[in-house]
């Protein structure tokens, strides 16, 4: 467990992790502060951040199980202590870590008698099992248990539907919520005329990411939501005959790049995240793992720097160069001087 003393600056807004601990493989805890804030600001930020943490963070989970020998979800297999339904519920609890999108396949194929745990799952290369000791089933006789698993990355909670059953496969309620809980509290200080606040934010995660990583992703999602308002004055608002109705045109990535070229405002580079640049998911994930989140981050690297990124190919660099050349008429240097 890590603890740090809380020292609040009276000048510059700062955030800090004041406590961090790992209670188990599937329970991480982090406590953060943000200060100094004006009266009312802490509650505004705390409420928005808590909702973003609980509802906007993406997670990876098992969403479907397939076995040709199982006629229905409530079937009991001779030689297995648990019913099929209980096995599905155990698989629902498996915590996975992955940064890739789309559907991935995994499998389990073991022979009893033995205990079957998450360690027996054969995952795709892009997926990591957080706690390999999680129980799945108990085989009491020398029988084979072979099942196929479907893994997806999503956000929130998605319930299985009755019409979603396919030949021998059974859907599982998808719980893509890495943040188990989030709370915020406020501490006021200062005299009556200059009241200021400290925001305390507590985050519990399931181990697939750290509280600090969750805080970063929630913050980025909130920034993405507010970016259109930063450019509102640059857009035409079309009013209908009804004075109470208006339509704001959608902001595209290309529109934002055009505005940057026109206005030459370097600060705008911080407001365009690489997930808005129409890059392929694989390229985007490689950049994200290297802490390249905005165009400003990207332009701070050379071609040589990008080639050092794990799993990055020359084709990925060429694709990035094409985007920068097309929309910015600039190029990344081959190496840093």
Swiss-Prot record:
<keyword id="KW-0150">Chloroplast</keyword>
<keyword id="KW-0548">Nucleotidyltransferase</keyword>
<dbReference type="InterPro" id="IPR011260">
    <property type="entry name" value="RNAP_asu_C"/>
</dbReference>
<dbReference type="Pfam" id="PF01193">
    <property type="entry name" value="RNA_pol_L"/>
</dbReference>
<comment type="similarity">
    <text>Belongs to the RNA polymerase alpha chain family.</text>
</comment>
<dbReference type="GO" id="GO:0000428">
    <property type="term" value="C:DNA-directed RNA polymerase complex"/>
</dbReference>
<dbReference type="InterPro" id="IPR011262">
    <property type="entry name" value="DNA-dir_RNA_pol_insert"/>
</dbReference>
<keyword id="KW-0804">Transcription</keyword>
<protein>
    <recommendedName>
        <fullName>DNA-directed RNA polymerase subunit alpha</fullName>
        <ecNumber>2.7.7.6</ecNumber>
    </recommendedName>
</protein>
<dbReference type="Pfam" id="PF01000">
    <property type="entry name" value="RNA_pol_A_bac"/>
</dbReference>
<keyword id="KW-0808">Transferase</keyword>
<dbReference type="Pfam" id="PF03118">
    <property type="entry name" value="RNA_pol_A_CTD"/>
</dbReference>
<dbReference type="GO" id="GO:0003899">
    <property type="term" value="F:DNA-directed RNA polymerase activity"/>
</dbReference>
<dbReference type="InterPro" id="IPR036603">
    <property type="entry name" value="RBP11-like"/>
</dbReference>
<feature type="region of interest" description="Alpha N-terminal domain (alpha-NTD)">
    <location>
        <begin position="1"/>
        <end position="233"/>
    </location>
</feature>
<keyword id="KW-0934">Plastid</keyword>
<dbReference type="InterPro" id="IPR011263">
    <property type="entry name" value="DNA-dir_RNA_pol_RpoA/D/Rpb3"/>
</dbReference>
<feature type="region of interest" description="Alpha C-terminal domain (alpha-CTD)">
    <location>
        <begin position="266"/>
        <end position="337"/>
    </location>
</feature>
<comment type="function">
    <text>DNA-dependent RNA polymerase catalyzes the transcription of DNA into RNA using the four ribonucleoside triphosphates as substrates.</text>
</comment>
<comment type="subunit">
    <text>In plastids the minimal PEP RNA polymerase catalytic core is composed of four subunits: alpha, beta, beta', and beta''. When a (nuclear-encoded) sigma factor is associated with the core the holoenzyme is formed, which can initiate transcription.</text>
</comment>
<dbReference type="GO" id="GO:0009507">
    <property type="term" value="C:chloroplast"/>
</dbReference>
<dbReference type="InterPro" id="IPR011773">
    <property type="entry name" value="DNA-dir_RpoA"/>
</dbReference>
<dbReference type="InterPro" id="IPR036643">
    <property type="entry name" value="RNApol_insert_sf"/>
</dbReference>
<dbReference type="GO" id="GO:0046983">
    <property type="term" value="F:protein dimerization activity"/>
</dbReference>
<dbReference type="GO" id="GO:0006351">
    <property type="term" value="P:DNA-templated transcription"/>
</dbReference>
<dbReference type="GO" id="GO:0003677">
    <property type="term" value="F:DNA binding"/>
</dbReference>
<dbReference type="GO" id="GO:0005739">
    <property type="term" value="C:mitochondrion"/>
</dbReference>
<keyword id="KW-0240">DNA-directed RNA polymerase</keyword>
């Amino acid at each position: 467990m890590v603890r740090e003393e809380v020292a609040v600056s009276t000048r510059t807004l700062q955030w800090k992790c004041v406590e961090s601990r790992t209670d188990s493989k599937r329970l991480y805890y982090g406590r953060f502060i943000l200060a100094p804030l004006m009266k009312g600001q802490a509650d505004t930020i705390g409420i928005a951040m808590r909702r973003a943490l609980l509802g906007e963070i993406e997670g990876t989970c098992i969403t479907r199980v397939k076995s040709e020998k199982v006629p229905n979800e409530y079937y009991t297999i001779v030689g297995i202590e648990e019913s099929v339904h209980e096995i599905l519920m155990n698989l629902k609890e498996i915590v996975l870590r992955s940064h890739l999108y789309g559907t991935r396949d995994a499998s389990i194929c073991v022979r009893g008698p033995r205990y079957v745990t998450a360690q027996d799952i054969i995952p795709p290369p892009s997926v990591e099992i957080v706690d390999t000791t999680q129980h799945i089933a108990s085989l009491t006789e020398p029988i084979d248990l072979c099942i196929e698993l479907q893994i997806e990355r999503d956000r929130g909670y998605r319930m299985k539907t009755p019409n979603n059953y396919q030949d021998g496969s059974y859907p599982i309620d998808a719980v893509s919520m890495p943040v188990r809980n989030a709370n915020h509290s406020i501490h006021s200080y200062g005299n009556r005329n200059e009241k200021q606040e400290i925001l305390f934010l507590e985050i519990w995660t399931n181990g697939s990411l750290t509280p600090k990583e969750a805080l970063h992703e929630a913050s980025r999602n909130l920034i993405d939501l507010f970016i259109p308002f930063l450019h509102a004055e640059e857009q035409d608002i079309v009013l209908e005959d009804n004075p109470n109705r208006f339509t704001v045109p959608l902001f595209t990535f290309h529109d934002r790049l055009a505005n940057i070229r026109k206005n030459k405002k370097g600060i705008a580079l911080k407001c365009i995240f690489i997930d808005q640049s129409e890059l392929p998911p694989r390229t985007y994930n490689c950049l994200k793992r290297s802490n390249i989140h905005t165009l400003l981050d990207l332009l701070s690297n050379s071609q040589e720097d990008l080639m050092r990124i794990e799993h990055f190919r020359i084709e990925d660099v060429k694709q990035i160069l094409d985007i920068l050349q097309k929309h910015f008429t600039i190029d990344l240097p081959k190496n840093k001087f």
